[in-house]
Protein backbone atom coordinates (compact mmCIF):
# COMPACT_ATOMS: atom_id res chain seq x y z
CA UNK A 1 0.00 0.00 0.00
CA UNK A 2 1.35 3.39 -1.01
CA UNK A 3 0.84 6.28 1.44
CA UNK A 4 1.65 9.90 0.48
CA UNK A 5 2.75 11.97 3.48
CA UNK A 6 3.25 15.74 3.67
CA UNK A 7 6.78 16.39 4.87
CA UNK A 8 7.86 19.80 6.19
CA UNK A 9 11.29 20.94 7.29
CA UNK A 10 11.02 22.02 10.98
CA UNK A 11 13.74 24.65 10.41
CA UNK A 12 11.22 26.65 8.36
CA UNK A 13 8.70 27.19 11.16
CA UNK A 14 10.09 26.09 14.56
CA UNK A 15 11.55 28.80 16.79
CA UNK A 16 15.03 28.36 18.21
CA UNK A 17 13.99 29.77 21.61
CA UNK A 18 10.75 30.76 23.27
CA UNK A 19 11.62 34.44 22.97
CA UNK A 20 11.89 34.39 19.19
CA UNK A 21 9.02 35.67 17.07
CA UNK A 22 6.83 33.15 15.30
CA UNK A 23 7.80 32.79 11.66
CA UNK A 24 5.00 33.77 9.31
CA UNK A 25 5.09 32.38 5.74
CA UNK A 26 4.65 35.14 3.17
CA UNK A 27 4.23 35.19 -0.56
CA UNK A 28 5.52 38.42 -2.10
CA UNK A 29 3.85 37.97 -5.48
CA UNK A 30 2.31 41.40 -6.38
CA UNK A 31 -0.69 39.66 -7.94
CA UNK A 32 -1.70 38.40 -4.50
CA UNK A 33 -1.50 41.89 -2.94
CA UNK A 34 -3.60 44.26 -5.08
CA UNK A 35 -4.05 46.80 -2.24
CA UNK A 36 -0.38 47.00 -1.28
CA UNK A 37 0.08 50.63 -2.41
CA UNK A 38 -3.03 51.86 -0.61
CA UNK A 39 -1.93 50.09 2.59
CA UNK A 40 1.54 51.65 2.32
CA UNK A 41 0.01 55.09 1.73
CA UNK A 42 -2.08 54.74 4.90
CA UNK A 43 0.98 53.65 6.86
CA UNK A 44 3.00 56.59 5.48
CA UNK A 45 0.20 59.00 6.43
CA UNK A 46 0.03 57.59 9.97
CA UNK A 47 3.83 57.68 10.30
CA UNK A 48 3.88 61.34 9.21
CA UNK A 49 1.15 62.25 11.71
CA UNK A 50 2.95 60.43 14.53
CA UNK A 51 6.18 62.19 13.60
CA UNK A 52 4.49 65.55 14.19
CA UNK A 53 2.87 64.29 17.42
CA UNK A 54 6.23 63.21 18.87
CA UNK A 55 8.15 66.25 17.60
CA UNK A 56 9.46 67.67 20.88
CA UNK A 57 12.91 69.01 19.98
CA UNK A 58 13.75 71.07 23.08
CA UNK A 59 15.90 69.12 25.56
CA UNK A 60 17.44 71.51 28.10
CA UNK A 61 18.53 75.06 28.84
CA UNK A 62 21.94 75.82 30.35
CA UNK A 63 21.69 78.96 32.47
CA UNK A 64 24.46 80.63 34.44
CA UNK A 65 25.75 83.44 32.27
CA UNK A 66 25.13 86.96 33.56
CA UNK A 67 25.14 88.55 30.10
CA UNK A 68 24.22 87.56 26.55
CA UNK A 69 26.02 84.56 25.03
CA UNK A 70 28.25 85.75 22.19
CA UNK A 71 30.10 82.61 21.01
CA UNK A 72 30.12 78.82 21.42
CA UNK A 73 32.92 76.32 20.72
CA UNK A 74 32.84 72.52 20.53
CA UNK A 75 35.47 70.27 22.10
CA UNK A 76 37.18 68.20 19.33
CA UNK A 77 37.73 65.14 21.55
CA UNK A 78 34.80 65.18 24.00
CA UNK A 79 31.13 65.08 23.02
CA UNK A 80 29.96 66.21 26.47
CA UNK A 81 32.13 69.36 26.68
CA UNK A 82 31.12 72.74 25.26
CA UNK A 83 32.60 76.20 25.84
CA UNK A 84 30.74 79.50 25.71
CA UNK A 85 31.78 83.15 25.88
CA UNK A 86 29.57 86.00 27.05
CA UNK A 87 29.35 89.74 26.54
CA UNK A 88 30.76 90.43 30.03
CA UNK A 89 34.08 88.67 29.30
CA UNK A 90 33.14 85.44 31.07
CA UNK A 91 33.94 82.00 29.61
CA UNK A 92 32.14 78.89 30.89
CA UNK A 93 32.96 75.23 30.30
CA UNK A 94 29.82 73.07 30.33
CA UNK A 95 29.28 69.38 31.00
CA UNK A 96 26.36 68.45 28.75
CA UNK A 97 25.85 65.04 30.38
CA UNK A 98 25.19 66.62 33.78
CA UNK A 99 23.79 69.84 32.20
CA UNK A 100 25.85 72.02 34.51
CA UNK A 101 28.78 74.42 34.38
CA UNK A 102 32.06 72.74 35.35
CA UNK A 103 34.28 75.85 35.28
CA UNK A 104 34.00 79.63 34.97
CA UNK A 105 36.80 81.99 33.89
CA UNK A 106 36.80 85.78 33.77
CA UNK A 107 38.77 85.90 30.53
CA UNK A 108 38.49 89.47 29.20
CA UNK A 109 37.38 93.01 29.94
CA UNK A 110 34.38 93.52 27.66
CA UNK A 111 33.00 91.10 25.08
CA UNK A 112 34.47 87.66 24.39
CA UNK A 113 34.58 88.07 20.60
CA UNK A 114 35.88 84.63 19.67
CA UNK A 115 36.54 81.21 21.10
CA UNK A 116 38.25 78.09 19.70
CA UNK A 117 39.64 74.84 21.10
CA UNK A 118 43.06 73.44 20.16
CA UNK A 119 42.87 70.33 17.93
CA UNK A 120 44.18 68.08 20.75
CA UNK A 121 41.62 69.42 23.24
CA UNK A 122 44.15 70.29 25.97
CA UNK A 123 43.71 74.07 25.77
CA UNK A 124 41.56 76.78 24.20
CA UNK A 125 42.02 80.32 22.90
CA UNK A 126 39.90 83.43 23.48
CA UNK A 127 39.95 86.93 22.00
CA UNK A 128 38.18 89.98 23.38
CA UNK A 129 37.68 93.72 23.26
CA UNK A 130 40.80 94.26 25.42
CA UNK A 131 43.06 93.59 22.36
CA UNK A 132 44.43 90.31 23.76
CA UNK A 133 44.63 86.68 22.66
CA UNK A 134 44.74 84.33 25.64
CA UNK A 135 45.46 80.61 25.79
CA UNK A 136 43.88 78.71 28.70
CA UNK A 137 44.37 75.17 29.99
CA UNK A 138 41.30 72.97 29.64
CA UNK A 139 41.95 71.30 33.01
CA UNK A 140 40.97 73.13 36.19
CA UNK A 141 43.86 74.40 38.37
CA UNK A 142 44.76 72.56 41.56
CA UNK A 143 43.42 73.52 44.98
CA UNK A 144 44.64 76.97 46.01
CA UNK A 145 46.11 77.77 42.58
CA UNK A 146 45.08 80.94 40.80
CA UNK A 147 43.38 80.80 37.38
CA UNK A 148 45.89 82.30 34.95
CA UNK A 149 46.18 82.04 31.17
CA UNK A 150 49.00 79.89 29.81
CA UNK A 151 49.97 82.62 27.33
CA UNK A 152 48.79 86.15 26.56
CA UNK A 153 49.43 88.00 23.30
CA UNK A 154 48.80 91.73 23.27
CA UNK A 155 47.64 92.99 19.87
CA UNK A 156 47.66 96.46 18.36
CA UNK A 157 43.96 96.47 17.48
CA UNK A 158 40.75 94.80 18.67
CA UNK A 159 40.35 91.16 17.64
CA UNK A 160 36.88 90.17 16.40
CA UNK A 161 37.32 86.46 15.69
CA UNK A 162 39.61 83.45 16.02
CA UNK A 163 39.87 79.93 14.60
CA UNK A 164 42.40 77.12 15.06
CA UNK A 165 44.03 74.94 12.42
CA UNK A 166 42.68 71.37 12.29
CA UNK A 167 46.02 69.60 12.91
CA UNK A 168 48.84 72.16 13.25
CA UNK A 169 49.87 74.47 16.09
CA UNK A 170 48.61 77.45 14.08
CA UNK A 171 45.64 79.75 14.60
CA UNK A 172 44.15 82.74 12.77
CA UNK A 173 42.68 85.95 14.17
CA UNK A 174 40.82 88.77 12.48
CA UNK A 175 40.19 92.43 13.23
CA UNK A 176 41.66 95.21 11.13
CA UNK A 177 43.45 92.43 9.23
CA UNK A 178 43.76 88.63 9.16
CA UNK A 179 46.79 87.34 11.09
CA UNK A 180 48.23 83.81 11.03
CA UNK A 181 49.97 82.93 14.32
CA UNK A 182 52.31 80.19 15.45
CA UNK A 183 51.48 79.16 19.01
CA UNK A 184 55.14 79.56 20.06
CA UNK A 185 55.53 83.12 18.76
CA UNK A 186 54.23 86.44 19.99
CA UNK A 187 54.15 88.01 16.50
CA UNK A 188 52.08 86.84 13.53
CA UNK A 189 53.71 84.68 10.84
CA UNK A 190 51.64 86.34 8.11
CA UNK A 191 49.24 89.26 7.91
CA UNK A 192 46.67 89.84 5.17
CA UNK A 193 44.84 93.10 4.49
CA UNK A 194 42.58 93.90 1.51
CA UNK A 195 40.81 97.22 1.96
CA UNK A 196 40.42 99.32 5.08
CA UNK A 197 37.29 97.83 6.66
CA UNK A 198 37.41 95.48 9.65
CA UNK A 199 36.89 91.72 9.37
CA UNK A 200 34.25 90.07 11.54
CA UNK A 201 34.85 86.31 11.12
CA UNK A 202 37.60 83.92 10.00
CA UNK A 203 37.39 80.12 9.47
CA UNK A 204 39.89 77.43 8.47
CA UNK A 205 38.92 74.80 5.91
CA UNK A 206 38.79 71.41 7.74
CA UNK A 207 39.62 69.43 4.55
CA UNK A 208 42.01 71.63 2.56
CA UNK A 209 43.67 72.77 5.77
CA UNK A 210 45.88 75.51 4.29
CA UNK A 211 42.80 77.40 2.97
CA UNK A 212 40.89 79.89 5.13
CA UNK A 213 38.18 82.46 4.53
CA UNK A 214 36.98 85.66 6.15
CA UNK A 215 34.06 88.05 5.86
CA UNK A 216 34.24 91.80 6.46
CA UNK A 217 32.10 94.83 7.08
CA UNK A 218 32.69 96.02 3.49
CA UNK A 219 30.29 93.21 2.33
CA UNK A 220 33.20 91.06 1.11
CA UNK A 221 34.19 87.41 1.45
CA UNK A 222 37.93 86.81 1.02
CA UNK A 223 39.78 83.51 0.49
CA UNK A 224 43.38 83.00 1.64
CA UNK A 225 46.08 80.35 1.34
CA UNK A 226 48.35 80.50 4.39
CA UNK A 227 51.30 79.41 2.22
CA UNK A 228 50.96 82.53 0.04
CA UNK A 229 51.77 86.12 1.03
CA UNK A 230 48.66 87.63 -0.60
CA UNK A 231 44.92 86.78 -0.57
CA UNK A 232 43.54 84.54 -3.32
CA UNK A 233 40.12 85.92 -4.22
CA UNK A 234 37.51 88.40 -3.06
CA UNK A 235 33.77 88.48 -3.69
CA UNK A 236 31.61 91.53 -2.93
CA UNK A 237 27.93 90.97 -2.14
CA UNK A 238 24.94 93.28 -1.95
CA UNK A 239 24.86 93.16 1.86
CA UNK A 240 27.23 92.22 4.65
CA UNK A 241 28.08 88.61 5.58
CA UNK A 242 28.05 87.89 9.33
CA UNK A 243 29.55 84.39 9.52
CA UNK A 244 31.04 81.60 7.44
CA UNK A 245 31.31 77.83 7.73
CA UNK A 246 33.09 75.24 5.57
CA UNK A 247 31.51 71.92 4.66
CA UNK A 248 33.43 69.22 6.62
CA UNK A 249 32.98 66.65 3.82
CA UNK A 250 33.35 68.71 0.63
CA UNK A 251 36.61 70.62 0.42
CA UNK A 252 35.47 73.47 -1.85
CA UNK A 253 32.03 74.22 -0.41
CA UNK A 254 31.27 76.89 2.21
CA UNK A 255 28.14 78.71 3.35
CA UNK A 256 27.82 82.40 4.24
CA UNK A 257 25.19 83.86 6.59
CA UNK A 258 24.07 87.21 5.20
CA UNK A 259 22.30 90.33 6.45
CA UNK A 260 19.66 90.05 3.70
CA UNK A 261 17.95 87.14 5.55
CA UNK A 262 19.50 84.47 3.28
CA UNK A 263 22.35 81.96 3.38
CA UNK A 264 24.53 81.44 0.31
CA UNK A 265 26.42 78.21 -0.39
CA UNK A 266 29.45 78.77 -2.66
CA UNK A 267 31.95 76.61 -4.48
CA UNK A 268 35.28 78.38 -3.98
CA UNK A 269 36.33 77.45 -7.55
CA UNK A 270 33.33 79.24 -9.11
CA UNK A 271 32.53 82.34 -7.10
CA UNK A 272 30.51 84.17 -9.78
CA UNK A 273 27.26 82.81 -8.34
CA UNK A 274 26.30 80.69 -5.32
CA UNK A 275 25.55 77.00 -5.69
CA UNK A 276 22.39 77.34 -3.58
CA UNK A 277 20.43 80.13 -1.88
CA UNK A 278 18.82 79.11 1.43
CA UNK A 279 15.79 81.27 2.24
CA UNK A 280 13.13 81.36 5.00
CA UNK A 281 14.54 83.62 7.72
CA UNK A 282 12.80 86.97 8.17
CA UNK A 283 15.72 88.83 9.73
CA UNK A 284 19.51 88.94 9.52
CA UNK A 285 21.28 85.56 9.78
CA UNK A 286 23.97 85.82 12.46
CA UNK A 287 25.65 82.39 12.50
CA UNK A 288 25.81 79.10 10.60
CA UNK A 289 27.28 75.64 11.21
CA UNK A 290 27.38 72.34 9.30
CA UNK A 291 26.44 68.91 10.56
CA UNK A 292 29.38 66.43 10.77
CA UNK A 293 27.93 64.55 7.78
CA UNK A 294 28.01 67.69 5.62
CA UNK A 295 24.44 67.03 4.45
CA UNK A 296 22.66 69.67 6.57
CA UNK A 297 23.36 73.07 8.08
CA UNK A 298 21.86 75.03 10.95
CA UNK A 299 21.50 78.81 11.07
CA UNK A 300 20.87 81.32 13.86
CA UNK A 301 18.96 84.50 13.16
CA UNK A 302 18.00 87.85 14.63
CA UNK A 303 14.35 86.78 14.21
CA UNK A 304 14.63 84.68 17.44
CA UNK A 305 14.67 81.30 15.69
CA UNK A 306 17.06 78.68 14.37
CA UNK A 307 16.47 76.74 11.16
CA UNK A 308 17.86 73.48 9.78
CA UNK A 309 18.41 73.28 6.02
CA UNK A 310 19.29 70.28 3.85
CA UNK A 311 22.34 71.31 1.81
CA UNK A 312 20.53 70.76 -1.51
CA UNK A 313 17.33 72.55 -0.46
CA UNK A 314 16.52 76.24 -0.64
CA UNK A 315 14.01 76.02 2.22
CA UNK A 316 14.36 74.79 5.79
CA UNK A 317 13.07 71.42 6.93
CA UNK A 318 12.81 72.53 10.57
CA UNK A 319 12.40 75.72 12.60
CA UNK A 320 12.96 75.92 16.37
CA UNK A 321 11.80 78.72 18.66
CA UNK A 322 10.60 79.30 22.22
CA UNK A 323 8.73 82.13 23.91
CA UNK A 324 11.73 83.14 26.03
CA UNK A 325 14.43 82.84 23.37
CA UNK A 326 15.57 86.22 22.08
CA UNK A 327 17.97 87.08 19.24
CA UNK A 328 20.08 83.97 18.57
CA UNK A 329 23.73 85.01 18.23
CA UNK A 330 25.56 81.68 17.85
CA UNK A 331 24.79 78.08 16.94
CA UNK A 332 26.73 74.79 16.77
CA UNK A 333 25.93 71.25 15.63
CA UNK A 334 27.25 68.52 17.97
CA UNK A 335 29.95 66.15 16.69
CA UNK A 336 27.70 63.07 17.03
CA UNK A 337 25.10 64.59 14.67
CA UNK A 338 22.37 64.27 17.34
CA UNK A 339 22.03 67.74 18.88
CA UNK A 340 22.08 71.45 18.08
CA UNK A 341 23.24 74.07 20.59
CA UNK A 342 22.39 77.76 20.37
CA UNK A 343 23.24 80.80 22.48
CA UNK A 344 21.03 83.87 22.65
CA UNK A 345 20.68 87.36 24.10
CA UNK A 346 18.82 86.32 27.22
CA UNK A 347 21.90 84.57 28.69
CA UNK A 348 20.90 80.94 28.00
CA UNK A 349 22.34 78.10 25.93
CA UNK A 350 19.67 75.74 24.61
CA UNK A 351 20.08 72.11 23.55
CA UNK A 352 17.81 70.81 20.76
CA UNK A 353 17.44 67.52 18.94
CA UNK A 354 18.72 67.57 15.38
CA UNK A 355 15.69 65.43 14.44
CA UNK A 356 12.68 66.74 16.36
CA UNK A 357 10.79 63.43 16.68
CA UNK A 358 13.80 61.16 17.22
CA UNK A 359 13.68 58.85 20.24
CA UNK A 360 16.78 59.26 22.40
CA UNK A 361 18.51 56.29 23.97
CA UNK A 362 19.04 52.69 22.87
CA UNK A 363 16.56 51.27 20.36
CA UNK A 364 15.56 47.63 20.22
CA UNK A 365 16.04 45.88 16.85
CA UNK A 366 12.27 45.90 16.23
CA UNK A 367 12.07 49.64 16.97
CA UNK A 368 14.95 50.36 14.62
CA UNK A 369 13.42 48.21 11.88
CA UNK A 370 10.05 49.97 12.29
CA UNK A 371 11.75 53.39 12.15
CA UNK A 372 13.65 52.51 8.98
CA UNK A 373 10.48 51.12 7.37
CA UNK A 374 8.46 54.24 8.24
CA UNK A 375 11.25 56.49 6.98
CA UNK A 376 11.29 54.72 3.61
CA UNK A 377 7.50 54.98 3.36
CA UNK A 378 7.62 58.73 4.09
CA UNK A 379 10.28 59.21 1.42
CA UNK A 380 8.21 57.20 -1.08
CA UNK A 381 5.02 59.24 -0.57
CA UNK A 382 6.59 62.60 0.39
CA UNK A 383 5.16 64.43 -2.63
CA UNK A 384 1.54 63.38 -2.07
CA UNK A 385 -0.44 66.52 -1.13
CA UNK A 386 -1.89 65.29 2.17
CA UNK A 387 1.41 63.90 3.47
CA UNK A 388 3.36 66.94 2.26
CA UNK A 389 0.94 69.31 4.01
CA UNK A 390 1.23 67.50 7.35
CA UNK A 391 5.03 67.12 7.14
CA UNK A 392 5.57 70.83 6.35
CA UNK A 393 3.17 72.25 8.93
CA UNK A 394 4.86 74.25 11.72
CA UNK A 395 3.56 76.60 14.40
CA UNK A 396 5.32 79.96 14.22
CA UNK A 397 5.31 83.02 16.50
CA UNK A 398 2.97 85.75 15.33
CA UNK A 399 5.89 88.13 14.68
CA UNK A 400 7.62 85.69 12.29
CA UNK A 401 4.33 84.73 10.62
CA UNK A 402 3.38 88.36 9.93
CA UNK A 403 6.88 89.15 8.62
CA UNK A 404 6.68 86.19 6.22
CA UNK A 405 3.37 87.53 4.84
CA UNK A 406 4.84 91.02 4.53
CA UNK A 407 7.89 89.74 2.64
CA UNK A 408 5.69 87.76 0.26
CA UNK A 409 3.77 90.95 -0.58
CA UNK A 410 7.03 92.87 -1.11
CA UNK A 411 8.48 90.10 -3.28
CA UNK A 412 5.34 90.02 -5.43
CA UNK A 413 5.41 93.82 -5.79
CA UNK A 414 9.04 93.70 -6.97
CA UNK A 415 8.18 90.94 -9.45
CA UNK A 416 5.26 92.96 -10.89
CA UNK A 417 7.46 96.03 -11.17
CA UNK A 418 10.09 94.08 -13.13
CA UNK A 419 7.41 92.60 -15.41
CA UNK A 420 5.96 96.06 -16.14
CA UNK A 421 9.41 97.53 -16.75
CA UNK A 422 10.18 94.72 -19.19
CA UNK A 423 6.78 95.08 -20.87
CA UNK A 424 7.28 98.79 -21.61
CA UNK A 425 10.94 98.58 -22.65
CA UNK A 426 12.68 97.54 -25.83
CA UNK A 427 12.80 93.71 -26.09
CA UNK A 428 16.03 92.42 -24.56
CA UNK A 429 17.03 95.76 -22.99
CA UNK A 430 15.97 94.73 -19.46
CA UNK A 431 17.66 91.44 -18.53
CA UNK A 432 16.12 88.86 -16.20
CA UNK A 433 18.62 88.38 -13.33
CA UNK A 434 18.61 85.02 -11.57
CA UNK A 435 18.07 84.87 -7.81
CA UNK A 436 21.58 83.46 -7.43
CA UNK A 437 23.49 86.05 -9.42
CA UNK A 438 21.68 89.27 -8.55
CA UNK A 439 23.23 89.55 -5.05
CA UNK A 440 26.85 89.18 -6.28
CA UNK A 441 28.24 92.58 -7.24
CA UNK A 442 31.85 91.72 -8.15
CA UNK A 443 34.54 89.05 -7.99
CA UNK A 444 38.10 90.38 -7.59
CA UNK A 445 41.12 88.14 -8.17
Swiss-Prot record:
InterPro entries for the chain: Sof1, WD40/YVTN_repeat-like_dom_sf, WD40_repeat_CS, WD40_repeat_dom_sf, WD40_rpt, WD_repeat_DCAF13/WDSOF1
Q: Where is this region: Required for nucleolar location?
A: 353-441
Cellular component terms (Gene Ontology): Cul4-RING E3 ubiquitin ligase complex; nucleolus; small-subunit processome
GO MF terms here are:
ubiquitin-like ligase-substrate adaptor activity
- Give residue spans, biased composition: Basic residues: 413-426, 436-445
Q: Which UniProt keywords apply?
A: Nucleus, Repeat, Ribonucleoprotein, Ribosome biogenesis, rRNA processing, Ubl conjugation pathway, WD repeat
Transmembrane residues, as ranges?
Answer: none
Output the GO biological process annotations, alphabetical, semicolon-separated. Answer: maturation of SSU-rRNA from tricistronic rRNA transcript (SSU-rRNA, 5.8S rRNA, LSU-rRNA); oocyte growth; protein ubiquitination; rRNA processing
SUPFAM superfamilies hit by this protein = WD40 repeat-like (SSF50978)
Q: Which residue intervals correspond to the WD repeats?
A: 64-104, 107-146, 152-191, 194-234, 236-276, 280-319, 323-362
The record's family statement is: Belongs to the WD repeat DCAF13/WDSOF1 family.
Q: How does it assemble?
A: Part of the small subunit (SSU) processome, composed of more than 70 proteins and the RNA chaperone small nucleolar RNA (snoRNA) U3. Component of the DCX(DCAF13) E3 ubiquitin ligase complex, at least composed of CUL4 (CUL4A or CUL4B), DDB1, DCAF13 and RBX1.
Q: What does this protein do?
A: Part of the small subunit (SSU) processome, first precursor of the small eukaryotic ribosomal subunit. During the assembly of the SSU processome in the nucleolus, many ribosome biogenesis factors, an RNA chaperone and ribosomal proteins associate with the nascent pre-rRNA and work in concert to generate RNA folding, modifications, rearrangements and cleavage as well as targeted degradation of pre-ribosomal RNA by the RNA exosome.
User: What is this protein called in UniProt?
Assistant: DDB1- and CUL4-associated factor 13
Source species of the chain = Xenopus laevis
